[in-house]
Structure formats: C-alpha cells, structure tokens
C-alpha cells in the first residue's frame, strides 16, 4: 500500500506523456462510464439521507417547536421535546385542543393531532425502508473502492512501463514483466468496471427510492383526507 501511494504521488508530481504504452481497447471509454455511475452513488446517498432525516432539522422545525413550547407554557402543559416535525406538529394540535373551549374547534385540533401522529408513524416506516436502500448503496460504494484501488495499480504499472521505455535504458525481462502485468491487470479491471456499470442496479435503486417515498406521501395524504 505504501509503494502504491508513493507511486501515485510521483505520478502527480512528475507527469509524463504516454507514447509507448497503451491500455486495452475500450478501457478508457468504460472507465469514463464507470466513474459517472460511481459518482451517482454519492449523489443518491445524499438524496436518501435528505428524504430520511429532513423532519429533524431546519428553520421550519425550529419554528414549530418554538410555537408548541409557547402554547404549552400558556396552558401549563409540559414543553415538547425536539422530535421530528410531524410528532411536534401533532403535539401542537394536542396542546391547542387543550386551550380552546369551543367543542367543534377542539375536535378539529384533536383530529389534526391524530393525523400528524399517524404521519409520524408512517415516516418512521419509510425511514426503515430507506435504511435498506442505504445498505445497498454502501455495498456499491465498497465495490467502487475495490475497483478504484485496482485502477490505481494499473495506472502505476503503466507509468512505470512508460518511464522505463522512455529512458531507453532497461532490462528486457523487466520490460516484458511490466507489459504482461499491464495487459493482464488492465483487462481484469476493465471487466470489473464493465460488470459494475451493467450490474450496479442504479436504475432499480432510483425506482425503489421513488416508490418508498410515494408510499409515504400517499399514506400521509390519506391521514389528511378528512381536512378536504
């Protein structure tokens, strides 16, 4: 690992033009495609995290908590905890139900509280499903690390071989060994990148994210149906 890191730094500091060495046909094209798919994984992880945890932060969340605490103080009800926005919204409805005397308004506040309590439950169910998606993305990320490690090895081999050939001073057996390593390692990692691009299941994961979120939105809408 130390030698690979050292060679990586050397390649960055002392760049050379590749004249005598070639990668397997199609290697660079599949590498570009692989890197695009790899980078999409990180973007999808951010999307999943955003959809999973949005209810725990932000200005809206702080305002709801602040409002609920004020209502609680005015009615001698214990101030709410900093939970998710749906649970806090439910608490707001419950606390308002305790502050009003009008029976009809009290009923609306109670129904409001119940609806958002149920939405909070649905959101927790959605979050659990999103955890499975996160696991899938993490597994793909681990595979990417393995592929990237092998890609760096190929780059180091090519660099060493090109440097050797440009020096015009080398032993034939060393040249032959590096050429064989470049060819074999290059083809192997090319196959891995090709398989990853075709089997990464990115499209399936995107569909799964949308489906999970859709199920939550529909369930939340059903709980709010009575307020039409």
Swiss-Prot record:
Entry-linked InterPro entries: AH/BAR_dom_sf
Main location: other
Residue spans crossing the bilayer: none
Matching SUPFAM superfamilies: BAR/IMD domain-like
Location(s), subcellular: Spore wall
GO biological process: sporulation resulting in formation of a cellular spore
Glycosylated residues, chain numbering: 88
UniProt keyword annotations, A-Z: Coiled coil, Glycoprotein, Sporulation
Domain of life: Eukaryota
Coiled coil segments of this chain: 115-195
GO cellular component, one term: spore wall
Family statement drawn from the similarity comment of this UniProt entry: Belongs to the SWP12 family.
This protein's name: Spore wall protein 12
Originating species: Enterocytozoon bieneusi (strain H348)
Gene: SWP12
């Amino acid at each position: 690992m130390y030698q690979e890191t050292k060679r990586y730094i050397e390649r960055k500091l002392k760049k050379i033009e590749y004249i005598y060495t070639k990668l397997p046909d199609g290697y660079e094209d599949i590498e570009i495609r692989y890197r695009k798919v790899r980078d999409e994984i990180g973007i999808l992880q951010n999307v999943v995290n955003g959809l999973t945890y949005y209810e725990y932060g932000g200005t809206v969340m702080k305002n709801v908590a602040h409002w609920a605490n004020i209502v609680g103080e005015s009615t001698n009800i214990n101030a709410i905890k900093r939970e998710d926005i749906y649970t806090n919204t439910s608490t707001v409805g419950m606390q308002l139900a305790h502050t009003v005397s009008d029976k009809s308004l009290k009923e609306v506040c109670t129904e409001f509280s119940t609806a958002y309590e149920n939405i909070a439950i649905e959101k927790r169910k959605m979050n659990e499903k999103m955890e499975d998606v996160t696991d899938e993305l993490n597994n793909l990320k681990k595979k990417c690390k393995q592929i990237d490690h092998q890609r760096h090895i190929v780059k180091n081999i090519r660099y060493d071989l090109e440097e050797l050939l440009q020096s015009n001073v080398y032993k034939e057996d060393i040249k032959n060994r590096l050429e064989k390593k470049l060819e074999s390692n290059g083809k192997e990692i090319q196959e891995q990148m090709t398989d990853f691009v075709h089997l990464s299941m990115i499209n399936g994961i995107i569909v799964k994210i949308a489906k999970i979120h859709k199920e939550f939105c529909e369930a939340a809408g059903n709980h709010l149906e009575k307020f039409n």
